[in-house]
């Protein structure tokens, strides 16, 4: 058969059509992929994956993280800061079990605060758990909370028979029991009231050590006693988170190698109900720390081991021996509960005792307690200036407004205290009347003052159904002792580190002079980033919670630019007309946002 020879130009046409087909197919493929990514969950998933890759890179590459911080500070980061992974819903940076498990077990060092450097931390916003709801309002929250807000069933499963808490439909309920009082904290407190003046205002501040879900502290509120409960992050998962969700004052802490972050002679009552603190270990170091914190004339209550406990005769004998060495008065031993009263005046500590206890010399500051190693010496009452014993300070509520002697011993302390009280009465009235801040609302229960000084802001709220965590920055004058003498509570803290609480635990955060919290004392330079501080504030603030910041117009303009990045809506207002200075007031509200479904 013959062959037809086509011209060269004709022979090339099939190849040209094949190339055109490829280009056309590629174009339609790109269009199809665009619509898939835009309108299907696959696109969301890939976008989320990309965001998380970027998020992880900010932690692994400090330079990229710093670039992002700089953009946010300048208001040039147009999108909100990315959300953290779903598994971070209960994340506490300084109490991270994965990080801390590598540390020494000696004296529970690994369960204390150990904070990562900012450059080691992803810059992201902690999400709420799936199904999160605005918390049950106070006082109903004392007895029930939403299960979805903290879907951790371990305590209810293990401790339900002891009356700690139960799962009932959408709620966790709190019958008010505990390991040492399964019949309810009310009955237990009635027993203590036979020996301790729980009524009448003699006792005001209490510390509940190893508190469970804080039913003891919650019940004491009806007696006018303000108990701060603490426990470490532990195997029960989120004891303190449950306490705070209920609206009970609480704080994450561990009595390990360091002093607890409170000044000397803060508490009128200290309580341990099966807290399992080995008070006599390490030459009674932990009992000595309790003694530092307990006000002279105050009461120490220990229920549970080793008090008349089977097979713990030696531990019980040692506990009694330490109390005798410190001249504590034995008030009662009632079953497995012992009650002691601390002596007033100079310690009668003998020169010879079986634990080798000695008085601290004058070089040991009694109230320094920020990363301060525990001392194996007993605080001298004479080393703490002012009147601070029960019986010499006023009863509650008079002590709230009377000038504490520990304020008077400061330079110009009397005048400064009285001026501070007037200033905050005026400011809070302006907040309520002119700025319409509803501080008496049932939705506001847990309040924080990040820069409390003498506690003037908290004092004006004393008649409201709120409690205030007064924070004294560790690098500022240590005035927390004055706050406790007033019958209020608080802690020392450095705001260049995360706070020891769970996410979403405060309804209202107040700060006067936010930039001063991160500035170096000897220069105008910052010790850390305002962006990181605002991300931390967002972590501990509940959705729909409010932030009030007082500072200069320049600082507040900067904060307002960053507020968008942490998903807050904000507005700036003039200060009250009676106040001097240039400061203004920023009010911000945290939005309730949720993770995309593909992020779980």
Curated annotation (Swiss-Prot):
Residue intervals annotated with topology Lumenal: 40-600
Subcellular location: Golgi apparatus membrane
Enzyme class: transferase
Biological process terms in GO annotation: cell wall biogenesis; cell wall pectin metabolic process; methylation; pectin biosynthetic process
Main location (coarse class): Golgi
Keywords on record: Glycoprotein, Golgi apparatus, Membrane, Methyltransferase, Signal-anchor, Transferase, Transmembrane, Transmembrane helix
GO CC entries: endosome; Golgi apparatus; Golgi membrane; Golgi trans cisterna; membrane; mitochondrion; trans-Golgi network
Membrane topology: Single-pass type II membrane protein
Topological domains annotated Cytoplasmic: 1-18
Top-level taxon in the UniProt lineage: Eukaryota
Enzyme Commission numbers on file: 2.1.1.-
Alphabetized InterPro entries for the sequence: Put_SAM_MeTrfase, SAM-dependent_MTases_sf
Pathway(s) where this gene product acts: Glycan metabolism; pectin biosynthesis
One of the Pfam families matching this protein, by short name: Methyltransf_29
GO terms, molecular function: S-adenosylmethionine-dependent methyltransferase activity
Function according to Swiss-Prot or TrEMBL: S-adenosyl-L-methionine (SAM)-dependent methyltransferase (MTase) which mediates the methylesterification of the pectin homogalacturonan (HG) and thus regulates cell wall biosynthesis, at least in suspension-cultured cells.
Family: Belongs to the methyltransferase superfamily.
PANTHER family from the UniProt entry: PECTIN METHYLTRANSFERASE QUA3-RELATED, SAM-DEPENDENT METHYLTRANSFERASE
Name of this chain's protein: Probable pectin methyltransferase QUA3
Native species: Arabidopsis thaliana
């Amino acid at each position: 058969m013959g062959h037809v020879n086509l011209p060269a130009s004709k022979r090339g046409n099939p190849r040209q059509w094949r190339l055109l087909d490829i280009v056309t197919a590629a174009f339609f493929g790109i269009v199809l992929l665009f619509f898939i990514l835009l309108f299907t969950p696959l696109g969301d998933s890939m976008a989320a994956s990309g965001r998380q890759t970027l998020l992880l890179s900010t932690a692994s590459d400090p330079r990229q993280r710093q670039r992002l911080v700089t953009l946010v500070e300048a208001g040039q980061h147009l999108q909100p800061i990315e959300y953290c992974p779903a598994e971070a819903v209960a994340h506490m940076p300084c109490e991270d079990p994965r990080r801390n498990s590598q540390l020494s077990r000696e004296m529970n060092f690994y369960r204390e605060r150990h904070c990562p450097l900012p450059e080691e931390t992803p810059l992201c916003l902690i999400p709420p758990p799936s199904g999160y709801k605005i918390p049950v309002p106070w006082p109903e929250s004392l007895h029930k909370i939403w299960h979805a807000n903290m879907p951790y069933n371990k305590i209810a499963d293990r401790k339900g028979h002891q009356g700690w808490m139960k799962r009932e439909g959408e709620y966790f309920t709190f019958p008010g029991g505990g390991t040492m009082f399964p019949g309810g904290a009310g009955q237990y407190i009635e027993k203590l009231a036979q020996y301790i003046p729980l009524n009448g205002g003699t006792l005001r501040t209490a510390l509940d050590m190893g508190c469970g879900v804080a039913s003891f502290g919650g019940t004491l509120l009806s007696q006018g006693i303000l108990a701060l409960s603490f426990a470490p992050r532990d195997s029960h998962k989120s004891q303190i988170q449950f306490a705070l969700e209920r609206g009970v004052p609480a704080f994450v802490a561990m009595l390990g190698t360091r002093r607890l972050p409170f000044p000397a002679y803060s508490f009128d009552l200290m309580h341990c109900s099966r807290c399992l603190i080995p008070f006599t270990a390490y030459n009674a170091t932990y009992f000595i720390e309790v003694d530092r914190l307990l006000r002279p004339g105050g009461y120490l209550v220990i229920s549970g081991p080793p008090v008349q406990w089977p097979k713990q005769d030696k531990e019980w004998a040692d506990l009694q021996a330490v109390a005798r060495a410190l001249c504590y008065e034995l008030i009662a031993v009632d079953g497995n509960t012992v009650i002691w009263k601390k002596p007033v005046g100079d310690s009668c500590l003998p020169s010879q005792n079986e634990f080798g206890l000695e008085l601290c010399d004058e070089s040991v500051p009694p109230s320094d307690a920020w990363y301060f190693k525990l001392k194996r010496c007993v605080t001298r009452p004479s080393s703490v200036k002012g009147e601070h014993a029960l019986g010499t300070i006023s009863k509650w509520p008079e002590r709230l407004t009377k000038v504490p002697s520990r304020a008077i011993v400061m330079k110009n302390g009397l005048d400064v205290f009285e001026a501070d009280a007037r200033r905050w009465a005026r400011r809070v009235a302006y907040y309520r009347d002119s700025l319409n801040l509803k501080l008496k609302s049932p939705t506001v229960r847990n309040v924080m003052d990040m820069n409390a000084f003498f506690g003037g802001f908290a004092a004006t709220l004393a008649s409201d159904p709120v409690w205030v965590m007064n924070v004294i920055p560790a690098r500022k004058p240590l005035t927390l002792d004055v706050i406790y003498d007033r019958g209020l509570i608080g802690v020392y803290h450095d705001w260049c580190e995360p706070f020891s609480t769970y996410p979403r635990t405060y309804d209202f955060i107040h700060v006067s002079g936010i930039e001063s919290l991160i500035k170096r004392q000897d220069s105008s330079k910052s010790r850390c980033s305002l962006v990181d501080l605002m991300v931390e504030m967002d972590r501990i603030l509940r959705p729909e919670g409010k932030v009030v910041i007082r500072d200069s117009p320049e600082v507040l303009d900067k904060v307002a630019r960053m507020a968008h990045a942490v998903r807050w809506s904000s507005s700036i207002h003039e200060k009250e007309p009676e106040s001097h200075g240039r400061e203004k007031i920023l009010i911000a509200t945290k939005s309730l946002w949720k993770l995309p479904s593909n992020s779980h």
